[in-house]
Amino acid sequence: QKLCERPSGTXSGVCGNNNACKNQCIR
């Protein structure tokens, strides 16, 4: 699963979940 990337560099939550931070996907 791809995770969301915060500006702090830490991953938070699952990318694509309810379109949450879909522009910050970590591959």
Curated annotation (Swiss-Prot):
Keywords: Antibiotic, Antimicrobial, Fungicide, Plant defense, Pyrrolidone carboxylic acid. The modification Pyrrolidone carboxylic acid is found at residue 1. It comes from the Eukaryota. It holds the Pfam family Gamma-thionin. GO terms for biological process: defense response to bacterium; defense response to fungus; killing of cells of another organism. Disulfide bonds: none annotated. InterPro entries: Scorpion_toxin-like_sf. Possesses some antifungal activity sensitive to inorganic cations and antibacterial activity against B.megaterium. Forms oligomers in its native state. Belongs to the DEFL family. This is Defensin-like protein 2.
